[in-house]
A protein has these predicted regions:
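Short beta-strand->alpha-helix linker/helix-N-cap micro-motif
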Residues: 18-84, 88, 92-108, 124, ...
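Alpha-helical segment of the N-proximal tetratricopeptide repeat
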Residues: 175-211, 215-224
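Terminal, low-structured helical/coil segments at or just beyond the last alpha-helical repeat
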Residues: 339-391
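Structural marker of alpha-solenoid helical repeat scaffolds
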Residues: 205, 238-239, 272-274, 306, ...
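Mid-sequence helix-capping/hinge segment at a functional interface
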Residues: 144-189
Length: 391
């Protein structure tokens, strides 16, 4: 993803949009049992920034950069290493820091102690390290601490339309500590079985915790267990940075479960905010399966307008035109498929029937449900491009 964006910026001749990288915070708590907290802070701050529209690099981008630079996960990084990671990802700013556990105050034996999180922002454009700022509170209130820190980061970035801290925290309700720990341990797990175990535990410990639901939904989607995946994806809340991606995959799950009306609703929700070609394509497929050919043709045309090089968009448009008896348009679209993909046997067969003005035969499986779906979702690429274009 990141390499694709860098290439797009280079050939487009537009200014690179400002992006922020959040690194795991370093453990100064003298307890290896709290190593997971550093990853939790990074993820929560990232989610907090993303929820306000900041372009934030993905965890996968950061892990890949560390691999390329041969940096050991979990190790405390030098200032030079922090700079190298950010620079390798073309980040504008890097958020990083450390946390420490303070002794339990007398009379508060039920407390796990207080956590002090200290953060800094490194401005890579000006090679300037900002002054440290911190949040302190009970370890049990880690989620709230992290979101308060996220609000401070937004403040330090001079983010436009910054909500009040009260409104910001209302939009990010607290999560149980044990649920947060389970979720983060799921992110850090090295096997799919461990990830599933930890994410499921996190979702059960706090039923309002959206992030593990998204992870579980994606897991079941990849296993093609669409009904179970849909159940998890439906629980991803509007305030979650993954909400629109969850809606996209929920639409695919519903489509595969033959709930075409529900799929259309999901794709419409996504298209209203992230009008990707892939989303319009899948919206058109859902509309076509509902026998709304006029709407489907319009949606497929939007996908095609965005990327005329993709043979699948030409195929879907041609196939729907053919089913609608619009043979001349179908011939044009199907020929466009074969210009881009000469070995497409299905397009060749349909083109022959369109040239003969021979429509679909009732009950013929070769004529039914031939729409081609897209399963890649590139919201980050879209948002970065919009930022670069100043929209």
């Amino acid at each position: 993803m990141h390499r694709f964006l860098a290439f797009a910026i280079l050939i487009g001749g537009v200014a690179r949009a400002e992006t922020v990288l959040t690194l795991p915070f370093f453990n100064h708590a003298d307890s290896a049992n709290l190593d997971w907290v550093g990853e939790s802070i990074a993820e929560s701050v990232r989610d907090a920034l993303a929820s306000e529209g900041v372009l934030v690099l993905d965890r996968e981008d950061r892990l890949e950069a560390c691999r390329r630079l041969s940096l050991r996960p979990g190790a405390e990084l030098t200032h030079a290493s922090v700079f190298k990671i950010g620079d390798s990802l073309d980040a504008s700013k890097v958020v990083y820091g450390f946390y420490e556990l303070l002794p339990v105050e007398p009379g508060k034996n039920q407390s796990k102690g207080s956590l002090r999180i200290t953060a800094r922002i490194l401005d890579l454009k000006r090679t300037l390290q900002g002054a440290p700022f911190s949040e302190i509170g009970a370890l049990e209130d880690l989620a709230s601490l992290e979101y308060r820190l996220g609000w401070q980061v937004l403040q330090q970035l001079n983010w436009k339309n910054l909500p009040t801290q009260e409104d910001f925290l209302q939009a990010h309700p607290p999560v149980r500590l044990d649920a947060v720990e389970s979720y983060v341990r799921g992110l850090l797990a090295t096997s799919s079985e461990q990830r599933h175990l930890f994410f499921t535990r996190a979702a059960r410990l706090d039923e309002h915790y959206s992030q593990p639901c998204f992870q579980l939904g994606k897991t079941y989607w990849e296993r093609k267990e669409y009904k179970i995946a849909a159940g998890w994806l439906e629980r991803v809340t509007r305030g979650d940075p993954h909400y629109l991606e969850a809606q996209f995959f929920l639409g695919l799950c519903r489509y595969n479960a033959a709930d075409f009306s529900g799929a259309e609703q999901c794709f419409r929700t996504v298209a209203a905010e992230v009008p990707l070609n892939e989303v319009f394509n899948d919206l058109g497929a859902a509309q076509a399966r509902r026998n709304d050919s006029q709407a489907a043709i319009a949606s497929f045309q939007k996908a095609l307008d965005g990327d005329s090089a993709d043979p699948d968009y030409h195929f879907n448009l041609g196939y729907t035109l053919w089913r609608s008896g619009k043979f001349a348009g179908a011939v044009e679209s199907l020929r466009a498929v074969l210009q881009r993909s000469p070995n497409d046997a299905e397009a060749t067969s349909l083109l022959g029937r369109a040239l003969k003005q021979e429509g679909p035969r009732p009950g013929d499986p070769r004529s039914e449900a031939r729409e081609r779906l897209k399963t890649n979702y590139e919201e980050a690429a879209y948002r970065q491009l919009q930022a670069e274009l100043g929209k």
